[in-house]
Amino acid sequence: MQTVLIALLRFYKLAVSPLLGSRCRFYPSCSDYAREAIQYHGAARGTYLAARRLCRCHPFSAGGIDLVPPPNSDARNAPHEAEASSHRL
């Protein structure tokens, strides 16, 4: 399942993303974040982390640096929008 999800993300990044342009307010981009989250945490938790990130990426978000939490950390300790906004690009 992990391989399928990463393949879908690669397809999105190569085929769809160039048509839409760069709109992500965070670093790394949401698609890169999702790929890393799935690689580090597996399909289920990685998808959950990616979905949380997508919910934070909107026009009213300040954005900033939001890295995937380390594999042994709790997702509740991940940087939130308020913390990420203090690390603007």
Curated annotation (Swiss-Prot):
Record-linked InterPro entries: Membr_insert_effic_factor_YidD
Keyword presence, Cell inner membrane: yes
Subcellular location: Cell inner membrane
Region (Disordered) location: 68-89
Biased composition (Basic and acidic residues): 77-89
GO cellular component, one term: plasma membrane
Keyword Lipid metabolism: no
Pfam family, one: YidD
Coiled-coil regions listed in the entry: none
Keywords recorded for this protein, A-Z: Cell inner membrane, Cell membrane, Membrane
Signal peptide region: none
Membrane topology: Peripheral membrane protein
Cross-referenced NCBIfam families: membrane protein insertion efficiency factor YidD (TIGR00278)
Family designation: Belongs to the UPF0161 family.
Purpose: Could be involved in insertion of integral membrane proteins into the membrane.
Protein name listed in UniProt: Putative membrane protein insertion efficiency factor
Annotated organism of origin: Burkholderia thailandensis (strain ATCC 700388 / DSM 13276 / CCUG 48851 / CIP 106301 / E264)
